[in-house]
Amino acid sequence: MTSRSQKLRNKTTLSVAIIWIGSLWLSISANTQPLLQGLVAQELFVEPHSTDSCSISMTEVSYPYTQLSAALFHPTQKNKLPPMTQTLQVICSVTVSQMTMEVVSDTQASSVTDADPTHFGLGHVNGQGSLGYYQVKLDEAKIGSDAVQLYHTADENAVGTLQSSLFLQSSGYQGWAKEGGSPASGQQFSVNMTVLPTLSSLKETHGPLVDGANLNGELVLRFPFSI
C-alpha cells in the first residue's frame, strides 16, 4: 500500500488558463504557446522529479454573442445568458491513481457581489459596479469511455460525496471517482464544462452602461494528479 508521504512525493500538477474576454467571447485553449492576440494561453507545470506527465487535449473554441446590447441589463433583475458547453480532456502518459481539479485564481473575484463559492466574476463597470458572474457546471465525467462520478472535497487526498454533476467551486478540489467512493484511475480523464453567465441588474452595475463594457473574467485551473 502506498503511504501518504509517497503519494505527496508523487503529486504533479497541470495547469490551464480559461479566459472570458472582450465582447462576450469565451476562448479556451490548450495551446502551450501564447496566442498572437493574447486571448488565452495554457501552461504545463511538471515537477522536476517526475518524468511522467499529463496534457490537456482541447480545441480552442470562441463563443460570440452577436446580439449583446445594453438592453440585456435590466433595472432590478439579473439576466441569464445562454449556457455554453465544451468537453475538457486530460491525457496522461501513464496510468494515474487520482486526478483532481482546483481553481487557482479568479482575476475578477472582486466583481462578485455575494459569497457563493460557485460564482466567478465577469469584471467591473462604472467604477466598482459589477457586470455579473458565471458558474461552471461539470458533468458527463468519464475515464476513457467509461462513465464515472464527480465529487468535491476540501482535502485532495479524500473523496467527497459522489455526484453525477456539480458546480466548480473557488476552494477545494473536484475529482473523478468510481462507484463505492474510491478515486478513479486511468490515463484519459474527461468532463463537460458548461459556462452559465448571469448579468447584473443596473442597480449592481451602478447605472446604465453609457460607455459600454466588456465581460472580462479569467479562471486559472490546476489539475493535481497522483502516479
Task: Please describe what each predicted stretch is.
Residues 2-5, 30-227:
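Mature extracellular/passenger domains of Gram-negative fimbrial/pilin and adhesin proteins
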Residues 15-25:
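Bacterial N-terminal signal peptides
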Residues 3-17:
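Bacterial N-terminal signal peptides that target proteins for export
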